[in-house]
Amino acid sequence: SVLGGFLLSNERREKQALREQPRELSQKLGQAIDGIASTSPLTVVDVGAQSLEDEDHVYAPMLAHTKGRVIGFEPLEHRRREREANERNIDLSLRPTLIGDGRSYTFHINNIDATSSLLPFNRDIVDDLNDHRTLETVATETVVTTTLDEAISDVSRVDFLKLDIQGFAYPALANAASVLSRTLVVHCEVEFLPFYLGQALFSDVDPLLRANGFRFVDFSRLSRSAFRSGPPASRDQLGWAEAVYFKEADTITNPSWILIQAFIAVTIYGKLSLARHLIGEYDRRSGTSYESLFDD
């Protein structure tokens, strides 16, 4: 119908505007942040920092719009060398440190590098799922972990903390109270099934981060698998996700930190209403009028 076509056309225009506005806002907010000496450069801490073949680093858009640096932790040497060779254009410091709770563990190096972990596979779970049953450990070594509080004690503010450490996020976060107190956004892989023996699940990580002053915002990615009996296209089991947390604004005393959160909300996640909400709080505290950018 004519009305249906009109409504569909409006919907398309709105969606197009939503796609375009984050790019413009990212540029303007990035310039604003670069102009505040106390906030620039922004700091990304990447725990589990190897590059993945099929995707960019989640924080790449952030580094494209403002000055930033990356402090990464990646235990596999060939993965560190690979990333250093491919990303010479950014301020990147990669360290071999294994982040954890400060104790000794057996590091399980698996046939798929990205699944290597301080914990062994839980074969009862892994063998049941079509996408996971070929995973296996090919080597082990004894290692000593370091807490985040120890590893980055000299970093005054963490703007974006990303963790992808295969079942070990909870111990890493539980021993990072000082770092979390000065972190603005956490992007963390969480599991809903125990792929690794002894691992904590999302239901454990969520209250830990809330207790440290963070609000759960969204899952930026959800991964589902089919059971091995098939059919493979029937991905019926939710296995893991990437969870996004923002430090509650009422716990932040420095207004510029809220401006950084707004920049991350729009630049990495495309969350315009969240960004505008945060900008409104920043304007209220700082006497600025950045919220007007959303009306352009």
Regions found by a protein language model. Name each.
Residues 1-4:
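Long, low-complexity intrinsically disordered regions enriched in Ser/Thr/Asp/Glu with frequent Gly/Pro
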Residues 6, 10-296:
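Phosphate/nucleotide-binding beta-alpha loop and adjacent structural elements of enzyme active sites
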